[in-house]
Amino acid sequence: METSSSMSVETTRSVQVDEWQKNYCVVTSSICTPKQKADAYRALLLHIQYAYANSEISQVFATNLFKRYTEKYSAIIDSDNVVTGLNNYAESIFALAGSRQADSNKWQSGLSIDNVFKMSCVQEMMQAGKKFEESLLEPADASVVLCKEPTAFEVPQLSVCGGSEDADILSSSGHDTDKTQAIPGSSLRCSPFQSARLPKETNTTKTCLTSSTSLGESATAAFHMTPLFGNTEKDTQSFPKTSTGLNMFLSNLSCVPSGCENPQERKAFNDSDIIDILSNPTLNKAPSKTEDRGRREDNSLPTFKTAKEQLWVDQKKKGHQSQHTSKSSNGVMKKSLGAGRSRGIFGKFVPPVSNKQDGSEQHAKKHKSSRAGSAEPAHLTDDCLKNVEPRMVELIMNEIMDHGPPVHWDDIAGVEFAKATIKEIVVWPMMRPDIFTGLRGPPKGILLFGPPGTGKTLIGKCIASQSGATFFSISASSLTSKWVGEGEKMVRALFAVARCQQPAVIFIDEIDSLLSQRGDGEHESSRRIKTEFLVQLDGATTSSEDRILVVGATNRPQEIDEAARRRLVKRLYIPLPEASARKQIVGNLMSKEQCCLSDEETDLVVQQSDGFSGADMTQLCREASLGPIRSLHAADIATISPDQVRPIAYIDFENAFKTVRPTVSPKDLELYENWNETFGCGK
């Protein structure tokens, strides 16, 4: 049995040696890809951990090997060079920062004017248009006023534009003196080609809704529409709704010359089409019924616009939206449900259930906007915030920006090395940017890691206070949202406001929850937020002159992503307070209370509190301060004066030690020290 076990051990070792040699050859080879080298480095790190777990190598040797291969692995992962690195965030960064145009001038469309004319449906429409034009000349169809004032509805016409350079594109709408006048939308005509009329009504089952007309009025007629595409409707359908549909249909048709197969030329032509449509106010009106019955709600519908047209309107007519809205709406629209509700771009949404709190909510919004007053335009006039939503700027100003009291370096006990390093690389460069330029400039990010309760948050506030910078305190929950894309917008808004408030310090508490390592099971929204944060911190669009410092604090540094660790240049270990720091904490807290501790008793308290963090020392002093209160009888608490309460004594600390325990275990301290030796920048 012993022989078989020894043989199996030897076999396992030989396999491990073969794997080690194979991976080592991969990382030293010049023909392997960076991806293969990264996989080989990960395999080597696993071999090192396996050998150390089986006590095959010593701790010092394992630490040195792990540090060496981790640095080489990080160099491949974070390298921007395509030949020697993976550039792990390149695709996401290029997708966000790239603003190249998708259309090319050399692209040709497969759809031409000749192909359109050969389509059977277009041929049917042209034939139906000719029949309709002939039916208008029959006197029995309807009483039509010729060469008079405009009628209540007009004949729809559709002109197909052809390819002549001298063609009059988008000419103004003219009146046909031989027939009835054309409705809005028929102004889109081109002269070189014969007009192709829309199909008109061929059956006149209902005739002549005539009435006694006075001066300035004209007769109206209702016709029965014959559908072209097989859709049958009831005979009782009224003509105003049908004409409204035709009006909305015609307003979206555009004439394209034959030489406009190029997408960019076609886009320019469509933009000129939109200009003509928006400049003619009659295109937004639908024909009405008789004036004695008033205006119908359907006739006040604004003209429907596609997403491209609406985007053009927002870009070209910014600042005149209110005037455009008042011109496009005729009368007051009723709040109704169903098909009669306005569905245009200026229509207001009407919920199916009436909300009784609308009045109070509107009053609250008006009160809030009036209370903000002149403070809102102050931070919206900056060029950095022109593309940021005002509500996000207000949220950052009110909730994320910290307005607490200033913090001094003397308020932080111990951690002298961390304080000296921060003064050297952060505070002084922000105070004197004229001296600290070039390589002396401040870093983009700092990571403060260590056990909880050691003053990492206090150090972040002190950096902002002593450097005169604006302090932003955020967490992972303040950047997440249930709506898609809101988290990325909040990150962009945060850095935009920080650029306007330079110098600025962005403190992220528990940064491991925001910039954790990526995995296969990670949600897409958190990945996008993480990518946007890294791009804003150090990406293609960032400027080296920005004085924005990101300070991250965590007690789980091993869970931070490799790319985030690379951007957080200075990684400082904040250990547990030493004996002198614990004595300073006790002295500062007891100076505000009545205390009769001697120096020897204070030293005993400091000696017994070995392994306590700063938060543990505060809890110990708080528990000891309750000792004099507990010594009183319950009946005396209601009548005793504050001066009659005895001072805090050493016996109170002895009782406090029985209930207060250190919150950091030796195993956790060993983990922090090992991570500091591998990735830390301190002693």
UniProtKB/Swiss-Prot annotation:
It is an enzyme of class 3 (hydrolase). The modification N6-acetyllysine is found at K348. It catalyses: ATP + H2O = ADP + phosphate + H(+). Its cofactor is Mg(2+). Expressed at high level in the testis. Detected in pachytene spermatocytes and in metaphase spermatocytes (at protein level). Residues 288-299 have a biased composition (Basic and acidic residues). Pfam families: AAA, AAA_lid_3, Vps4_C. It is found in: Nucleus; Cytoplasm; Cytoplasm, Perinuclear region. Residues 279-383 are annotated as: Disordered. One of its GO terms (molecular function) is magnesium ion binding. InterPro entries: AAA+_ATPase, AAA_lid_3, ATPase_AAA_core, ATPase_AAA_CS, FIGNL1_ATPase, MT-severing_AAA_ATPase, P-loop_NTPase, Spast_Vps4_C. Residues 322-331 have a biased composition (Polar residues). The N-terminus is necessary for its recruitment to DNA damage sites. Hexamer. Interacts (via N-terminal one-half region) with RAD51; the interaction is direct. Interacts (via N-terminal one-half region) with SPIDR (via the C-terminal region); the interaction is direct. Interacts with FIRRM; may regulate homologous recombination. Belongs to the AAA ATPase family. Involved in DNA double-strand break (DBS) repair via homologous recombination (HR). Recruited at DSB sites independently of BRCA2, RAD51 and RAD51 paralogs in a H2AX-dependent manner. May regulate osteoblast proliferation and differentiation. May play a role in the control of male meiosis dynamic. This is Fidgetin-like protein 1. It comes from Mus musculus (Mouse).
